[in-house]
Amino acid sequence: MWKSGAIVLLTAGAVQAADCAGASLRFVESAPRDRFELVVGAQNLTAVRVDLRGSAGRLIFDTASGGTGVEVFQPLRDEGGVTAEGVADGAQMLRVVLKDGQVGTRAAFSIDVDDRLTGSDLGQIRVTGGEMAGAIAVFETADGTQQQAVFDARNRAEVCP
């Protein structure tokens, strides 16, 4: 009896996640550049902001040599579909403007992200999913509204209207 109830709960959660039609932003840890991948959901978007201030790993953007970050640094770079503005070394917030924010389009940008934990899982130069958790993505829509989503331990921030 209990097992069938658990299956129903798990299935319901999977259906809910699959039905999410909002915007999503995924963080991909990589070397030498970390990457953010955007999927525009049910509403047109004009820009996306990333706010690392609430992240479990006390994350920062490492954009210059000799600054706040560790070893490797990489400035913000368009990887397809965004206009990349400068980001100060050690900053915790960035904003990119979308070249084409129509429903269903994708965009990506890269930058180095480091954590500031003394006992981090993979060292301060690499970010794990648990360290990104709590960071915020703000999706700016074409009609001027903002939709906010919190990154989870899977490195995803999704708006499910």
Go through the PLM ranges and name each one.
Residues 43-110:
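Structured domain cores in non-transmembrane regions
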Residues 1-8:
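Sec-dependent signal peptide recognition
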Residues 121-161:
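Glycine-rich, aromatic-bearing surface loops/beta-hairpins
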Residues 23-43, 53-55:
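Short beta-strand elements of extracellular/lumenal beta-sandwich folds
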Residues 12-17:
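N-terminal signal peptide c-region/cleavage motif recognized by signal peptidases
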Residues 115-118:
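Short acidic/polar inter-strand loop motif in beta-rich domains
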